[in-house]
Amino acid sequence: MTLRQTLEQQWQDGGALATALRPLGALTGKVARWRRRHIQGRAASIPTIVVGNLGVGGSGKTPLVAALARQLTVAGWRVAIVSRGYGARPPHWPYRVQRDDSPQQAGDEPLLLAQEQGQTQAVYLCPDRHRAIAAAAADGYNLALLDDGFQHLALQPSLRLLVLSGPRPLGNGHCLPAGPLRECPDAMLHADALLMDAAAAAAIPERNGPPRFLFRIQPKDLVAVNDPCRSRSLDSLQGQHVTAVTGIARPQRFVASLEGLGAIPDPRFFPDHHSFCASDIAHLPRPLVMTAKDAVKCREFAQADDWTLRIEAELEASSQPWLEQSLLPWRS
């Protein structure tokens, strides 16, 4: 078991290690509050929307960014998605992701977003978000959608959207390393809106604070990893034994999704952001099902019976007029 897995288990179980780390967690929270109080970011030349979270690990943020990009495009914006580019090795910074880039060059999540979004949105990478946004603006895009960045205080965004998901959206309520939070729970008040799944909405009482909008992640179909033109219906999973391969932060959710679709999964977990190679999956029993985030890293050596579970995020309808009203000051 890795150190991260050990810590995550401790956070969930309230183990002795997590308890012993609480003084460090309290220090993390104090530093985060100090940064929010004293770091004054500057606005970009075009409106910017940050989509982020309070904790480490998956929260459904990437499919939400894709859904918001579609929604904003329909509303008439030219949307550029901006990412820090964690783990990416592009030839230069900032860098505009190309659909045929390798995962090593572009990073798995930015490449996934670039391939899903087609030609109407672009994806830009740079640790300095201001430089990435400036590059997007120079290319004619008039709205930047930041995949993560709630804690990136050098930027003063137009809107901050905070994603909360799962029955324990705030974990054990403690900051790193005593818990999964990057900031204290009251940092939610710095958001302009909360995007919550049903489980998170039930777990966090509704009080005075930012408006809430529900979302859900819906499986759509199965797509062949080595040929996106081939697909299968979800009904084909009923009663089928499959090998579930994943290298994401919360793999149990993926397994639960497959079980909910009637499959009988045999899980094979890899670390989050794992760089897959052919030998990782070559001898696993088929059929094999993986997440879209993992599939972009396996396309070159995937076999005919390797499949991606394609998902989409759906936001409640009331989020659209709220977004349009919030962005009115930037309409030209």
From Swiss-Prot:
- Which amino acid positions bind ATP, per UniProt? 55-62
Q: Which Pfam family, giving just one, matches this sequence?
A: LpxK
Q: Keyword Kinase on this protein? A: yes
What's an example of a GO molecular-function annotation for this chain? ATP binding
Going by the record, the broad EC class of this enzyme is transferase
- Keywords assigned by UniProt, alphabetized: ATP-binding, Kinase, Lipid A biosynthesis, Lipid biosynthesis, Lipid metabolism, Nucleotide-binding, Transferase
Keyword Kinase listed? The answer is yes
What does this gene product do?
Transfers the gamma-phosphate of ATP to the 4'-position of a tetraacyldisaccharide 1-phosphate intermediate (termed DS-1-P) to form tetraacyldisaccharide 1,4'-bis-phosphate (lipid IVA).
Q: What is this protein called?
A: Tetraacyldisaccharide 4'-kinase
From which source organism is this entry?
Acidithiobacillus ferrooxidans (strain ATCC 23270 / DSM 14882 / CIP 104768 / NCIMB 8455)
